[in-house]
């Protein structure tokens, strides 16, 4: 039985019929699309779904914007900088529309769940044809049909977040690695974060739907999957019964053909012993954990509403490493959160020193309208934020270099992903700990697992020599 928040078969049938109608209209024509994606892996996967629908409708992908008949921007709202970039880009595209009045321009994603952004587009960007959000991607064929036939701006942003969609066509960016959504939305409401407002509350996919998708990927030759969610550790809580994220990993580990399983992102407050033991015991689950800490000060963590302490986070790290000694741990850190003093920042630096992360995504706090942190007192000056970010990056780069140097001379297993973009004579591959290794090899090895000896190391990329092909 479907959960109540699944999109109905009748609605999906309607969209499929519209796709067929547009494909019929496009028969015998050379029509093209281009998608620009901003933000997280969830957005990347949403863009794969949009691309899949466009190709079902007869469009072909192009990098040449002058050639495009449909141009989509899939947007991110996590930081103000991303919004500024998108709106600047949309302004630039007006000239393209002037040269090609038949071009359909669409904007989707998290930014479109912000009312003030939608109003700005309505008032200042009349050259944009379609506006839709994160909850009704499945309606894109209908919105495109309206835009093609009415030539008036189509805005369809819904507040209803209870929409999980199965069965949409997907044009994946790789034929080797695949993103697989397992849970949408977030219930955590960190005070700085806009995601619960743009992506909605947590909604888990049914395990049978996830298993069916991964089995299909295995049959098509995919070797690696990355399970996606704002908080994968919450998977299954809304489904009832005896399913959780650790149990899902056990189910997926049994699927033949899949060689590697990754996942992101995990919330520290929801890391369980059961999950740690699953990561330890399941041979396909890679030794890499992305565990955002955000700050090293208990005062700041409380203001962020992260619902764990510095001490609890360090306990998790100790337990993970005790069970999985060779694991790579990465994180997210925000500097300059409202109320952060120099002492608070020193506590963050101290935590980074103690944990010795393999890598970190570091950011200056960005005020997001509508979040509690935006109206907090003691906002930190931008120059102070920049100074702290530089110091944090310098420390983390030093640690990342030292961690990578420990691998020099060792033989590691890699999945060979393709030809190096910098050197056509080399292949690019990835270790189980998610580090990139380049080495000389033939293109026929792409898609294979191999052992490579590390000969040179940098912070997150390495050079190596092929030792043996495994399978």
From Swiss-Prot:
Binding site for [4Fe-4S] cluster 2: 186, 190, 193
Subcellular location: Cytoplasm
Domain TRAM: from-to ranges: 405-468
Enzyme Commission number, as recorded: 2.8.4.3
GO cellular component, one term: cytosol
Cofactor note: Binds 2 [4Fe-4S] clusters. One cluster is coordinated with 3 cysteines and an exchangeable S-adenosyl-L-methionine.
Cofactor(s) this protein cannot do without: [4Fe-4S] cluster
GO MF, one example: 4 iron, 4 sulfur cluster binding
Residue ranges of domain MTTase N-terminal in the record: 31-149
Entry keyword Transport: no
Record-listed [4Fe-4S] cluster 1 binding positions: 40, 76, 110
HAMAP family: tRNA_metthiotr_MiaB
Family under the similarity heading: Belongs to the methylthiotransferase family. MiaB subfamily.
Subunit structure: Monomer.
Function: Catalyzes the methylthiolation of N6-(dimethylallyl)adenosine (i(6)A), leading to the formation of 2-methylthio-N6-(dimethylallyl)adenosine (ms(2)i(6)A) at position 37 in tRNAs that read codons beginning with uridine.
Protein name in UniProt: tRNA-2-methylthio-N(6)-dimethylallyladenosine synthase
Species of the source: Caldanaerobacter subterraneus subsp. tengcongensis (strain DSM 15242 / JCM 11007 / NBRC 100824 / MB4)
High-level lineage: Bacteria, Bacillati, Bacillota, Clostridia, Thermoanaerobacterales
